[in-house]
């Protein structure tokens, strides 16, 4: 408690009275000294006048001067007497003001006593009402405790049954893992066989490319020989026509011997020129043509044999591909079954395998139908089916083994580039007027791309080199620098330039054909890419859903803990105080908070049960956060509230701080234990959710019931802790009441000592005033020098008295406001505002002293005589102690104390 308010007021009152009396006495003494000095001067002047009577003639001028000085001194003495009368009038005015102040103080004291009595009656009524409410809450909490114990026993039995089911599921999972490992080993063996078959296919591709080059070379030589034969036939026809013309001329007119000799010479010259111009005879050309035709027949026979061997290899490859697709479909079905059992999601795994199977069958039929037309079309379809199956195999491998996502994205990019190249090749082959050479070149261009998608980057650069080597007739103008372009664009540009060189067409025309083909195939490629992205993002979606479900479970646990704390009825006065403090800090009403949390909790459950989407969940979350932000305020207000509450409770930190710290530490330790138990149960819940294939919803509900059971037990423990804290606070209140009684006794002792001190000071003041009266009567001579300092003490006295009155009124106003603002804290303490009562008693003591002084100051001599007042403070303290004793006797023993 603060013991400094009333001694300060006592000292201020004593200082004002003593200083005022002392200043008046000092002024009177000073005036007496001046009168004595003036009397001495007059005596000396008279002596000098007697001495100088003999020298009257010489001292006439000096005598006149002294006479003038005496006249002036008399005037000053009259002025001093006038000032004395004025000061007496002022003192009478101050006495009247003092009487008015005393009357006001009496009125204020009566009003304070009335307010104190009203506050005490209100506090007693509120205390009795709170006791009745606490008793009813204790009875309800006992019933709830019994019900919670029964529920705890039932949930423990259910937990044992669930543990047995978990063990059975673990055994089933081990068996499934063994089957999965066997399937993985068989899949690896099939992959090795597929790699060997692919290698054989590539060897056959290389041989076919060489055969195609040889056939092209032989075709070019045959074309050249055919052109020469046609030229020779034209020359022979021309000669025959000329011979016929000459014969006709000869028949018309027969020449002479000279003309005949001349003509024979010309014919010989023409024959020589013809022999020199054509060293090989037409017979030799016909022999070469026959040889070339025989070679063409042999090459066609070899092509037929190679085609038959290729058909056999393709049939074998198709058989192995079908087996691979079947095993892949089985593996995907098994994987989907595992994922459904672990996460409860439905995936259609057989879709991609069926698509790949259909593509492969379509490629086989296309190969059989178009075998007679061109080998390039069949190879393009076979490459597309192979790329499809290769992509499906990569996707299945990534889903089983779990390769990084960057590799999957790279694979998708490579596959898209290969599809573009295949579409370019198909458009070039399907153009009207294109030769089989173009189809073979397109096959040779797409072959390295497949190598690029299956091998590393170094092998891809080697294949790009082979593309250049396949086109020896290409001009150096068409070469492209590979440093400035990516690998995929480099390969596409090579294929386009080779097609341009072979067909001898413009680049714009080739690009226009490619644009048309891409626009026609755009829709189909978009649908296939969409399906591929769907199959690729299944695993990512499952991971995201798993993470979202975990985070939502955590949010649910936090919200359920908060709602349980808010819905729990407080069973004692201390917990009631704490809950009210929390509501003040956060500005949340319990009903509003519980409704908001229940709505958000329902949204979380709907999201987990797939009844709502992420949009609705995000809306609920944003609304909850907005509500929380709108109902919070700064921590500075919280600190001020805490200080006010501590002042209201008269918190004794030196005595109960260590006890409170120990209790808080115990509460924190027990809360940590409960939190670890909740975390272990949440981990068990997550494990059950991951392991159970069929009974996921039922297991989740049981685990949530177990978690609720644990939270209920935690709430029961918190109730017990709050009850212990309540008992501790009641003991502290009792100790504080005892301490208050001791303080009251010390205040009474100090009041007695104060009265004794005032008696001693009053006797001293009486002696000083008597001395002043004696000196005033003895000194009737006027004062020579009037001073203006006598008005200053009176002004100081009036200013001090007015400031004291204003200060007491302000304190009275503040105490009235504090009473109006803090009735709840006074009711909770059960002491009825002990600090305000303490201040009121101090003010009452000061008012009693002032009233005694005012009664004693009715006489003009300012005599202060103390008077004893019957009742007053002692009766007030007796009332307070009687109420405290009644409150102690009415306390009900706590049933949970043991």
Curated annotation (Swiss-Prot):
PANTHER family: FILAMENT-LIKE PLANT PROTEIN 4, FILAMENT-LIKE PLANT PROTEIN 7. Belongs to the FPP family. Interacts with WPP/MAF proteins. Residues 808-822 have a biased composition (Basic and acidic residues). Residues 429-482, 693-723, 777-835 are annotated as: Disordered. Residues 460-469 have a biased composition (Polar residues). This is Filament-like plant protein 7. Keywords: Coiled coil. Residues 434-459 have a biased composition (Low complexity). The gene is FPP7. Residues 23-224, 287-320, 703-764 form a coiled coil. The keyword Kinase does not apply. It comes from Arabidopsis thaliana (Mouse-ear cress). InterPro entries: FPP_plant.
């Amino acid at each position: 408690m603060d013991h400094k308010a009333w001694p300060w007021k006592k000292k201020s009152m004593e200082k004002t009275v003593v200083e005022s009396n002392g200043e008046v006495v000092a002024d009177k003494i000073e005036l007496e000294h001046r009168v004595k000095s003036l009397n001495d001067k007059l005596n000396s002047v008279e002596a000098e006048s007697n001495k100088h009577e003999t020298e009257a003639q010489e001292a006439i001028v000096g005598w006149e001067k002294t006479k003038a000085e005496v006249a002036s001194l008399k005037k000053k003495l009259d002025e001093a007497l006038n000032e004395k009368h004025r000061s007496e009038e002022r003192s009478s005015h101050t006495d009247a003001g003092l009487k008015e102040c005393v009357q006001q103080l009496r009125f204020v004291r009566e009003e304070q006593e009335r307010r104190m009595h009203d506050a005490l009656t209100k506090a007693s009524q509120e205390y009795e009402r709170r006791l009745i409410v606490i008793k009813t809450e204790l009875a309800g909490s006992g019933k709830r405790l019994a019900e919670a114990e029964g529920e705890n026993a039932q949930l423990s039995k259910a937990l044992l049954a669930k543990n047995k089911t978990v063990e059975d599921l673990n055994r089933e999972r081990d068996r499934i893992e063994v089957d999965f490992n066997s399937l993985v080993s068989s899949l690896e063996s099939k992959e090795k066989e597929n790699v060997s078959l692919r290698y054989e296919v590539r060897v056959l591709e290389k041989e076919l490319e060489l055969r195609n080059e040889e056939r092209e070379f032989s075709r070019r030589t045959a074309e050249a020989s055919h052109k020469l034969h046609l030229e020779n036939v034209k020359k022979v026809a021309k000669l025959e026509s000329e011979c016929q013309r000459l014969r006709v001329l000869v028949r018309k007119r027969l020449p002479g011997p000279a003309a005949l000799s001349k003509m024979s010479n010309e014919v010989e010259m023409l024959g020589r020129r013809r022999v020199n111009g054509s060293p090989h005879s037409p017979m030799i050309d016909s022999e070469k043509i026959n040889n070339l035709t025989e070679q063409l027949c042999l090459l066609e026979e070899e092509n037929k044999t190679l085609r038959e061997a290729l058909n056999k290899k393709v049939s074998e490859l198709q058989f192995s591909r079908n087996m691979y697709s079947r095993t892949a479909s089985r593996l995907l079905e098994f994987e989907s079954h595992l994922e459904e059992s672990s996460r409860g999601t439905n995936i259609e795994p057989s879709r991609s395998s069926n698509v790949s199977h259909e593509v492969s069958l379509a490629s086989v039929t296309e190969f059989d139908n178009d075998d007679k037309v061109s080998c390039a079309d069949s190879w393009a379809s076979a490459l597309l089916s192979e790329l499809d199956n290769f992509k499906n195999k990569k996707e299945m491998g990534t889903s089983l083994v779990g390769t990084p996502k960057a590799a999957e994205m790279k694979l998708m990019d490579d596959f898209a580039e290969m599809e573009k190249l295949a579409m370019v090749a198909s458009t070039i082959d399907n153009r009207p007027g294109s030769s089989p050479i173009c189809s073979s070149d397109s096959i040779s261009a797409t072959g390295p791309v497949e190598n690029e998608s299956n091998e590393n980057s170094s092998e891809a650069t080697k294949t790009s080199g082979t593309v250049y080597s396949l086109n020896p007739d290409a001009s150096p103008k068409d070469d492209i620098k590979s440093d400035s372009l990516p690998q995929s664009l480099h390969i596409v540009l090579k294929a386009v330039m080779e097609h341009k060189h072979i067909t001898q067409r413009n680049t714009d025309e080739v690009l226009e054909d490619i644009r048309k083909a891409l626009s026609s195939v755009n829709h189909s490629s978009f649908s296939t890419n969409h399906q591929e992205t769907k199959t690729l993002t299944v695993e990512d979606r499952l991971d995201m859903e798993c993470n979202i479900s975990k985070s939502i479970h955590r949010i649910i646990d936090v919200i359920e803990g908060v709602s349980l704390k808010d819905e729990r009825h407080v069973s004692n006065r201390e917990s009631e105080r704490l809950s009210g403090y929390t509501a003040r800090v956060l500005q949340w009403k319990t009903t509003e908070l519980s409704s908001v949390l229940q709505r958000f909790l329902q949204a979380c459950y709907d999201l987990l049960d797939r009844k709502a989407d992420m949009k609705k969940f995000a809306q609920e979350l944003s609304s909850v956060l907005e509500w929380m932000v709108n109902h919070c305020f700064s921590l500075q207000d919280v600190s001020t509230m805490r200080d006010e509450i501590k002042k209201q409770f008269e918190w004794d930190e030196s005595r109960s701080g260590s006890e409170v710290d120990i209790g808080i530490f115990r509460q924190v330790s027990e809360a940590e234990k409960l939190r670890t138990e909740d975390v272990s149960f949440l981990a068990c819940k997550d494990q059950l959710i991951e392991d159970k294939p069929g009974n996921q919803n039922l297991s989740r509900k049981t685990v949530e019931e177990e978690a609720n059971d644990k939270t209920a037990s935690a709430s029961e423990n918190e109730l017990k802790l709050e009850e212990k804290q309540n008992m501790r606070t009641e003991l502290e209140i009792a100790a504080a009441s005892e301490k208050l009684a001791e303080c009251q006794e010390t205040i009474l002792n100090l009041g007695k000592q104060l009265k004794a001190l005032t008696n001693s000071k009053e006797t001293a003041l009486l002696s000083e005033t008597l001395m002043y009266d004696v000196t005033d009567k003895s000194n009737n001579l006027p004062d020579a020098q009037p001073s203006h300092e006598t008005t200053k003490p009176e002004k100081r006295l009036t200013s001090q008295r007015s400031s004291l009155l204003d200060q007491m009124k302000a304190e009275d106003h503040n105490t009235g406001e504090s009473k109006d603002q803090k009735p709840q804290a006074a009711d909770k303490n059960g002491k009825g505002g002990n600090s305000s009562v303490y201040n009121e008693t101090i003010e009452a003591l000061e008012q009693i002293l002032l009233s005694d002084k005012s009664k004693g100051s009715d006489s003009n001599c300012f005599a202060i005589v103390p008077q004893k007042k019957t009742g007053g403070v002692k009766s007030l303290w007796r009332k307070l102690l009687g109420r405290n004793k009644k409150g102690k006797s009415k306390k009900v023993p706590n049933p949970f104390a043991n």
